[in-house]
């Protein structure tokens, strides 16, 4: 049996977004907010999160917009254009949700990592740009810029990892503009490419795990 209670952990539905809390027996102070891709639900991000941070508390969140048999985070117009009012509204609700969930479960947002995939990663990038200071660490898998008009947000002190797929023909070309955008706003961006398409897997987990350990390893070596 895994040390987590599993994907079927209780579904909390009393905050703005439904979510499951998965806390390992040997949980430390690390936590990951998980934002899934389009047309699925919160359980799909748990396996990769377990690979990335086995001792982290996981907050697996479900998007509120229906898409086929699953969910997404905001309305889309085409595969690469999105309803701006929906982005801003859902991002605002998520900012409040993250603060409330962290307070309820004793999580430190300053130490939390927001791990998003595809549509979920795009919600996280919007969250950073529209709510300065809320997100301090973000790992964005297969992300793209979605805001037509980003405010002049100061992201100094925010660490961001962007992982694109070399064979992701639709969304891969949008990764460099996102890197440029977040750098422009002062974020510390690490951009990587994996030899895959839009799907995510072991290579992504390895990169995120290494990225998260980086500053801690440097600090230990310096000490």
Place the predicted regions along the sequence by residue.
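Active-site signature of alpha/beta-hydrolase-fold catalytic machinery across serine-
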Residues: 47, 126-130
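Serine-hydrolase catalytic machinery in alpha/beta-hydrolase-like enzymes
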Residues: 10-107
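C-terminal catalytic histidine-bearing segment of alpha/beta-hydrolase fold enzymes
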Residues: 179-183, 188-223
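Gly/Ala-rich beta-loop-alpha elbow adjacent to hydrolase catalytic centers
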Residues: 115-120, 124
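A conserved short beta-strand
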Residues: 133-145
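Short beta-strand/loop motif that positions the catalytic acidic residue
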Residues: 161-164
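Short alpha-helix in the alpha/beta-hydrolase fold that links the catalytic acid
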Residues: 47-48, 172-181
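Acidic catalytic loop of the alpha/beta-hydrolase fold
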Residues: 166-173, 199
């Amino acid at each position: 049996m895994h040390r987590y209670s599993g994907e079927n952990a209780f579904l909390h539905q009393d905050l703005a977004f439904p979510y499951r809390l998965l806390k390992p027996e040997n949980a430390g102070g690390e936590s990951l907010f998980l934002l899934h891709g389009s047309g699925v639900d919160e359980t799909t991000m748990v396996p990769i999160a377990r690979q990335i941070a086995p001792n982290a508390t996981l907050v697996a969140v479900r998007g509120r917009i229906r898409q086929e048999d699953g969910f997404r985070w905001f309305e889309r117009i085409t595969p690469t254009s999105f309803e701006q009012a929906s982005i801003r509204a859902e991002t605002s609700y998520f900012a409040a949700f993250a603060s409330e969930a962290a307070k309820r479960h004793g999580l430190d947002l300053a130490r939390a990592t927001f791990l998003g995939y595809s549509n979920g990663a795009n919600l996280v990038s919007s969250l950073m740009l529209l709510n300065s200071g809320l997100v301090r660490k973000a790992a964005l898998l297969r992300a793209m810029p979605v805001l037509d008009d980003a405010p002049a947000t100061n992201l100094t002190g925010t660490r961001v990892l962007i992982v694109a797929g070399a064979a992701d023909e639709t969304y891969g070309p949008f990764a460099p503009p996102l890197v440029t955008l977040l750098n422009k706003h002062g974020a510390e961006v690490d951009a990587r490419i994996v030899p895959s398409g839009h799907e995510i897997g072991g290579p992504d987990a390895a990169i995120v795990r290494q990225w998260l350990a980086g500053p801690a390893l440097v600090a230990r070596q310096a000490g």
